[in-house]
Structures are given as C-alpha cells and as structure tokens.
Amino acid sequence: MLNARFLFSLLLLPSLLGAQPTKPVQKPAAPPTLDARQRPRHLTDEQLLDQVQRQTFRYFWNFGHPVSGMARERSNRSFDYGDEVVTTGGTGFGLMAIIVAAERGWITRAQAAARVSKIVNFLWKADMYHGAFPHWYDGATGHTIRFSLKDNGADIVETSFMYEGLLCARQYFTRDTPDEGNVRSKVLWLWEGVEWNWFTQGQNVLYWHWSPNNGWSMNHPLHGWNEALVTYVLAAGSPRYAIDKAVYDQGWATGPDYLNGKTYYDR
C-alpha cells in the first residue's frame, strides 16, 4: 500500500506497444488566433487565477491525443515535432489539471475518470525501461520517440512528473466504478514496477537517463538543487525498489546550492 506520509510529502512539493487505432488518428486543430481586444480586463486576483486555471485545463483536455489521451508536446507545430508526439511529464501536469476541473465542476467526475483511465490503459501497454517511461511517446502506438540523439529510453525525471499526477489520481478516484477502479489498480501496478534503485548504477546517486541502445552514455547524475527533487522523493518512497538514504545525502544534497552544516536563517 502507498505510504500516507510519502503521499502527503508528494502533495506538498512545489510546483502500446499495443493495438493500433481502429480509425485514422485525428490531426490536432491549429490553436485559435487570439485577439488582444477580446482579452478580459479589470480582473480581480481571484478571477485571474480562475482564468489561468481553467485555460490550463482546457489545453490538456481539448488538445489531448485522441488515442492515448496523453498531453501533446507544445502545440506540435513547433520544431517539427509531428502530430503524434506526446510527453510523459506534461501528461502528469495534465492529470492534476483534470482532477481540479472535476472538483470544480468544469467537467463531470465520470468524464475525468474516463480520460484518466484511457491514459493509464495506454501507459500499461506502452514502452517502459525498468519500469520508467521515456520523455516522449508516439501517442497512437506507445512506441518511444527519441528526445535527442542518445535519449531514446528511460527518463526518470519525466517519469517522476508523470507519477506526481498518477499517484494523485489514484488517491482522488476512490469510487466503485469501472473507470475509477481501473485507474487505482493500474496505477498501483505501474508504480510498484519502477526500479528506482537500478538507476543508481550501484552508486549513491540517481542517473537521469538510460537507453537500451546507448546504455548510460548520457551520464547525467541528478544533483540538487533543481526541479528533479521529486525524483528522489518518489525513489525513497517506492514500495519495492526504494533507494537508500545515502543516495539522497551523497547524490542529491551535495549540490553547490546546499549549505549543509551551516546556519543561514537564525529566526
């Protein structure tokens, strides 16, 4: 079972190979042209936050891949990414936005559960590497799309961003319906399969990438301080493949931004 303290810590953080689609994949619609004259004016702080939150949700909801439900990389018109590229980390952010939308009544809970269920069904059959996801997938097939020349395998930071959303979805969808039950069971299966301690190479530090073609050639150890802190939190909380405390102490917390053993705030 998931550790309650671990989940609470996660919520406090700042911040196929499978069946082909039975019908042609829809091409994404071009983003609408915005007219500055139609922008809302004189918003209160609350209204502005509501607007930002709703528009964030709309990107992930309206522009999700039609087969997988996953979040697209930018608008897919930038840098010639192509229409099928979806991103794991961005999908984790999108899952959180979908939960918010359901809670605020912008969509029904059933609609939210159906979309999240589609996403976990896709991930359940997609390419994985020692339980970790790649940065990019083909949203129709579940095959890995390389992010860079040697980055065509596991990306444990993007995997972590994905699990921030997946684990929160598992805690949110608690009702006895087919979609909500599917989310809980498959997220647990996926989560328990990530071999976090394997990504240390037997050392006291986590490594960002691994590729079946290129091995550890990216050679990118994760040292703090940056957005990858969540990777160490998740790796420490793994029910099956947890890292030792020394991996955090000697890997993450040795970065130049840590003032270990020194007083820097005395009130």
Give residue ranges: language-model regions:
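N-terminal secretory signal peptides that target proteins for export/translocation
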Residues: 1-3
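Bacterial N-terminal signal peptides
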Residues: 5-15
